[in-house]
From Swiss-Prot:
Primary localization: mitochondrion
This protein's UniProt keywords: Mitochondrion, Ribonucleoprotein, Ribosomal protein, Transit peptide
Family: Belongs to the bacterial ribosomal protein bL33 family.
GO MF assignments: structural constituent of ribosome
Database matches in Gene3D superfamilies: Ribosomal protein L33
Name the UniProt record assigns to this protein: Large ribosomal subunit protein bL33m
Compartments (UniProt record): Mitochondrion
UniProt-listed GO biological process terms: mitochondrial translation
GO cellular component, one term: cytosol
InterPro entries named in the record: Mitoribosomal_protein_bL33, Ribosomal_bL33, Ribosomal_bL33_sf, Ribosomal_zn-bd
Species for this entry: Mus musculus (Mouse)
Subunit structure, interactors included: Component of the mitochondrial ribosome large subunit (39S) which comprises a 16S rRNA and about 50 distinct proteins.
Transit peptide: 1-8
């Protein structure tokens, strides 16, 4: 029995890497991974420039994981 080469469509990954930017206006950012199906990410995280926990909001998708 011979196996034929069949091309399959590449499946999408379940997680993506996104860039989160500080809302304190310092320009500090970091990368975080989230589920593809989830809504845009916003969370409290430490900003070392202002030495406080501030709100970080998802700015853009970087890549699929």
């Amino acid at each position: 029995m011979l196996l034929s080469a069949v091309s399959f469509a590449k499946s999408k990954s379940k997680t993506i890497l996104v860039k989160l930017v500080s809302q304190a206006g310092t320009g500090f950012s970091f990368n975080h991974k989230r589920s593809r199906l989830r809504e845009k990410l916003s969370l409290l995280h430490y900003d070392p420039i202002v030495n406080k926990k501030v709100l970080f909001v998802e700015q853009k998708k970087i890549r699929s994981l």
